């Protein structure tokens, strides 16, 4: 396909945006299940607590779905000349798969290689301290393939640098809901919770990952070694 010869139209951008809205609703349902049930309190009613949870979820979803057209523009502007054809092919592929949305993240919607291509471009924004635009780009990768762990971590790092602590907390919670034994996410999530003095949370995440590695007989793996080192630094 001669991607560079095709015009990436506004209509196609809106098609992508509409489709990603369906998957965003699915993600919101996951997030609601991550919160602890409200408890009776003299300070806040059950309904007030539920409203606060919904506000936090809505805030995160605004982050997650903010301006698809902006993200596409950033990728096309940031990619090197030799990357442009590949990037356009990925976007056209996203449009061509519109009929295959099933109401949940599709682990195979965009391939690992294609995610890595986009992530290399987004990483330049992170390295260049352009965290706001980097966040746009990492979020867009997640919307194309929700099971690419580097994009979740990149998004979290951008929001952390922007000072959006509550968003970072929810990002890691949602990422670990989708990929509970992804050791890349586990290690970065633990580091974040240690940095905000939530050591019990960090230990719980690390221990869960460690136990899974033991179950899989991977005690000699690099992931096991790194988790052990992280646990030693916390305990």
Language model: regions and residue ranges:
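Long, contiguous interaction/recruitment modules in multidomain scaffold/adaptor proteins
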Residues: 1-114
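Register position in tetratricopeptide repeats
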Residues: 127, 161-162, 195, 230-233
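Conserved positions within tetratricopeptide repeat
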Residues: 135-136, 169, 200-204, 225
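TPR alpha-solenoid repeat register
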Residues: 151, 185, 219-220
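TPR/TPR-like (Sel1-like) alpha-helical repeat modules
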Residues: 194-217, 229
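Alpha-helical adaptor scaffolds
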Residues: 107-181
């Amino acid at each position: 396909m001669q991607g560079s010869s095709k015009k990436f139209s506004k209509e196609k951008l809106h098609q992508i945006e509409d489709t990603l809205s369906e998957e965003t609703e699915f993600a919101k349902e996951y997030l609601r299940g991550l919160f602890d049930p409200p408890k009776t309190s003299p300070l806040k009613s059950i309904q007030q607590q539920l409203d606060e949870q919904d506000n936090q979820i809505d805030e995160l979803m605004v982050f997650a779905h903010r301006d698809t057209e902006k993200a596409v523009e950033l990728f096309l502007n940031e990619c090197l000349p030799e990357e442009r054809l590949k990037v356009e092919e990925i976007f056209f592929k996203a449009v061509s798969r519109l009929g295959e949305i099933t109401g949940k993240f599709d682990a195979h919607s965009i391939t690992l290689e294609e995610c890595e291509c986009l992530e290399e471009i987004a990483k330049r924004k992170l390295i260049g301290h352009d965290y706001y635009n980097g966040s746009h780009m990492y979020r867009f990768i997640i919307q194309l393939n929700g099971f690419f762990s580097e994009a979740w971590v990149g998004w979290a790092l951008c929001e952390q640098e922007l000072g959006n602590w509550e968003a970072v907390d929810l990002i890691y919670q949602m990422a670990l809901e989708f990929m509970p034994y992804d050791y890349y996410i586990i290690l970065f999530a633990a580091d974040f919770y240690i940095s905000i003095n939530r050591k019990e949370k960090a230990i719980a995440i690390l221990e869960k990952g460690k136990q899974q590695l033991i179950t899989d007989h991977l005690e000699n793996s690099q992931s096991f070694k790194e988790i052990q080192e992280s646990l030693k630094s916390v305990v």
